[in-house]
Amino acid sequence: MPLQLAKSLKLHNDKVWSIDFEPVRGLLATGSTDRAIKVLQLKNGKENLLDVLDDTVHKKAVRSVAWRPHSDLLAAGSFDSTISIWTQSDLDLEEGAKLEMELLAIIEGHENEVKGISWSQDGCLLATCSRDKSVWIWETDEAGEEYECISVLQEHSQDVKHVVWHTKHNLLASSSYDDTVRIWKDYDDDWECAAVLTGHEGTIWCSDFSKEEDPIRLCSGSDDSTVRVWKYIGDDEDDQQEWVCESTLPNAHRSQIYGVAWSPSGRIASVGADGVLAVYKEKQNDSEVSEWEISATYKAAHTVYEINTVKWVNIDGKEMLITAGDDGRVNLWNYQD
């Protein structure tokens, strides 16, 4: 089978909303409705629970977690409308060691639930989005102790579900209950909407940029049960960007799609309310039109439970998938064409 369950870890007493992986030391962070944030090390075929962060810091569910690139900082966004920043006390981890994460900062500003957070690739900017229909961009220094809001983006008409930065270009994408994805760009230190992607017929829960530098592409998952691939056409210096829907991926889901992830090797994974984990690959042909096919599906990937998120990770030199669901479990998957 192309998809095989490698491990299933029962980590939380309630649904797991978010996961993020720090590849250098193999650190996995999880956020849950039970308000706990857990940090594990996945290395040498073993999993070691390093720390359970103070579950009294957030008063409601932890909806999103994100490691700062090339850093020891972890950010967590909560339904209590705040974002917490954590730092590691011991950066030299030995096998079997424990790790103490210390609270470094609490960021306040949103008027309602924080749904998504994402660090820019250089780690200088943190984007957050909320049920209050806004996207905030925060600037910080190397220490990550202080955060200044440099822009509040309020062009979405409904709840903003997700934000993600491009890994190579200075672009931010936000996905919303208003059925759109908006692309944001920095114009002389002023963040503005460069494009609005329309076409989905329902809430857009998630999006992810491709890891290639050119062309610039984005995949999105929606309430309408589809995954779409969008492509930027034009010059990176254009003020108003033109994006086209390059492809609607073959139908692998029958319900809402809550998570999408684009791998460094070019595969797209999706998960959702129907409990299906799907992987798609792009057909290799001479056509200018992007064509995709389903490479693998796994039904009931979290038994009868909904799946909230999916990530591609590299563990011990091997590309794998991680999913998290309403069952409080985090599942690790082997994938092979």
From Swiss-Prot:
Gene Ontology biological process terms from the UniProt entry: iron-sulfur cluster assembly; tRNA wobble uridine modification
WD repeat feature ranges: 11-50, 57-96, 109-148, 155-194, 199-240, 252-290, 301-337
Protein's cellular compartments: Cytoplasm; Nucleus
Family annotation (SUPFAM superfamilies): WD40 repeat-like
Main location: cytoplasm
Domain of life: Eukaryota
SMART domains per record: WD40
Family as reported in the entry's similarity comment: Belongs to the WD repeat CIA1 family.
Name of this chain's protein: Probable cytosolic iron-sulfur protein assembly protein 1
Organism: Candida glabrata (strain ATCC 2001 / BCRC 20586 / JCM 3761 / NBRC 0622 / NRRL Y-65 / CBS 138) (Yeast)
